[in-house]
């Protein structure tokens, strides 16, 4: 993997002037901004150090940052989180990553793995997570959870399953995009799956609000394509589960500005210092 990254950098360097190298990766990154402590959703990354290996080849500043932290930074500096303090970011994909900015700085914690919101345990002895624990919110509010909810309902009701499959691709498989399209057309299974996912995420937002009192919670990743169809039930669920409801101002829940390139934008800005 590192060799492939080095080859890619060489290709860019042959065509462009490069001032630094910022890498966004879906993994826990230690505070040295180089060593990978763990990667629940990507095999064989643990203990790799991108920075030390790449620095041997290029005489340039190099940093590696958790993808959600990098995306959080992009939204804070240039996107829909600009000027907000504190602000939380969730990236909802295969897993569920998190980032946090307090007083204009990324919060990394003592060793660098802080704000890993996707691994808050919400269900004791719940679904096994890639991190090795059980019942992490990632297993209930991620894109993978969305797919699981849909498939469970398809299995329980074959007639409704056929209706959903009308929105599938040529292979007959369903995807997050399939569910988004179907939900926008009012498909029962797709809407139910999104509502279950939103309920869990709203529950988590309520807990994080009491912990950090953010001005806003920004949501990125593929679920943003569903728009208010997803965000509205997240807000409703947050209010439903909010402790001390009515005694404080709830955070805004808003969609991220940037899509899949958010991590790249954030990493590029972070390496500039």
Annotate each predicted stretch with a short phrase.
Residues 97-101:
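Short beta-strand scaffold segments in enzyme catalytic cores
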Residues 113-116:
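Structural signature of FAD isoalloxazine-binding scaffolds in flavoprotein oxidoreductases
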Residues 62-66:
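General beta-strand structural signal in soluble alpha/beta enzymes
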Residues 67, 93, 267:
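Active-site glycine-centered loops adjacent to acidic/histidine catalytic or metal-binding residues
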Residues 1-20, 29-35, 51-60, 77-84, ...:
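ATP-binding/phosphotransfer module of carbohydrate and carboxylate kinases, centering on a glycine-rich
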């Amino acid at each position: 993997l590192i060799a492939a990254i080095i080859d890619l950098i060489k290709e860019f360097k042959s065509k462009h002037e490069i001032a630094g190298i910022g890498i966004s990766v879906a993994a826990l990154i230690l505070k040295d901004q180089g060593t990978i402590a763990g990667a629940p959703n990507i095999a064989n990354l643990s203990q790799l150090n991108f920075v030390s290996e790449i620095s041997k080849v290029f005489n340039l500043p190099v940093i590696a940052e958790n993808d959600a932290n990098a995306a959080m930074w992009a939204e804070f500096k240039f996107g829909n989180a600009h000027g907000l303090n504190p602000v939380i970011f969730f990236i909802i994909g295969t897993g569920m990553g998190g980032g946090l900015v307090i007083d204009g700085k990324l919060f990394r914690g003592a060793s660098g793995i802080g704000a890993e919101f996707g691994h808050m345990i919400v269900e004791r002895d719940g679904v096994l997570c890639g991190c090795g624990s059980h019942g992490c919110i990632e297993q209930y509010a991620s894109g993978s959870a969305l797919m699981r909810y849909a498939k469970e309902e398809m299995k329980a009701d074959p007639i409704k399953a056929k209706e959903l499959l009308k929105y599938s691709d040529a292979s007959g498989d369903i995807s997050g995009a399939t569910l988004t399209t179907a939900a926008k057309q009012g498909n029962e299974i797709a809407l139910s799956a999104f509502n279950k996912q939103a309920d869990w995420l709203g529950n988590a937002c309520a807990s994080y609000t009491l912990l950090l009192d953010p001005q806003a919670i920004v949501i990125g990743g593929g679920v943003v394509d569903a728009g208010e169809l997803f965000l509205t039930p997240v807000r409703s669920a947050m209010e439903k589960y909010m402790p001390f409801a009515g005694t404080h101002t709830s955070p805004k829940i808003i969609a991220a500005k940037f899509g899949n390139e958010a991590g790249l934008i954030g990493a590029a800005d972070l390496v500039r210092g």
